[in-house]
């Protein structure tokens, strides 16, 4: 396995561990999620380039579109929560509260 694939898998693993460790704040969770999406995008781009299959080039673009939508929704949720509560703790996101 080439060293670049191992580096990308390591970046994904570190982002996943960061997501599991720093899950009390929404901003740190969003940053870790973006790191995971970036490593998945790079991995899918490298796989599409190595496969030489024309339809495989659509997968990284679709992943990038979903990552942009996820970032926009996450940032709007972060702004809404910080305007309402004054901080970005995830325990404020309970659906049982009114």
Swiss-Prot record:
Gene3D superfamilies: 1.10.287.3510. Pfam families: Oxidored_q2 (PF00420). The keyword Protease does not apply. Keywords: Electron transport, Membrane, Mitochondrion, Mitochondrion inner membrane, NAD, Respiratory chain, Translocase, Transmembrane, Transmembrane helix, Transport, Ubiquinone. GO terms for cellular component: mitochondrial inner membrane; respiratory chain complex I. It catalyses: a ubiquinone + NADH + 5 H(+)(in) = a ubiquinol + NAD(+) + 4 H(+)(out). It comes from the Eukaryota. The chain crosses the membrane at residues 1-21, 29-49, 58-78. The keyword Lipid biosynthesis does not apply. One of its GO terms (molecular function) is NADH dehydrogenase (ubiquinone) activity. Signal peptide: none annotated. It is a multi-pass membrane protein. It is found in: Mitochondrion inner membrane. GO terms for biological process: ATP synthesis coupled electron transport. Its EC number is 7.1.1.2. PANTHER family: NADH-UBIQUINONE OXIDOREDUCTASE CHAIN 4L, NADH-UBIQUINONE OXIDOREDUCTASE SUBUNIT ND4L. Core subunit of the mitochondrial membrane respiratory chain NADH dehydrogenase (Complex I) which catalyzes electron transfer from NADH through the respiratory chain, using ubiquinone as an electron acceptor. Part of the enzyme membrane arm which is embedded in the lipid bilayer and involved in proton translocation. Core subunit of respiratory chain NADH dehydrogenase (Complex I) which is composed of 45 different subunits. Belongs to the complex I subunit 4L family. This is NADH-ubiquinone oxidoreductase chain 4L. It comes from Presbytis melalophos (Mitred leaf monkey).
């Amino acid at each position: 396995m080439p060293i670049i694939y191992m580096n990308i898998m390591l970046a994904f693993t570190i982002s996943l561990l960061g997501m599991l460790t720093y899950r009390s704040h929404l901003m740190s969770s969003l940053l870790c999620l973006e790191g995971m999406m970036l490593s998945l995008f790079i991995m899918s781009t490298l796989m599409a380039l190595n496969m030489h299959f024309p339809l495989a080039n659509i997968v990284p673009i679709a992943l990038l579109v979903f990552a942009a939508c996820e970032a926009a929704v996450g940032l709007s949720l972060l702004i809404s929560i910080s305007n309402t509560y004054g901080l970005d703790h995830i325990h404020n996101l309970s659906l049982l509260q009114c």
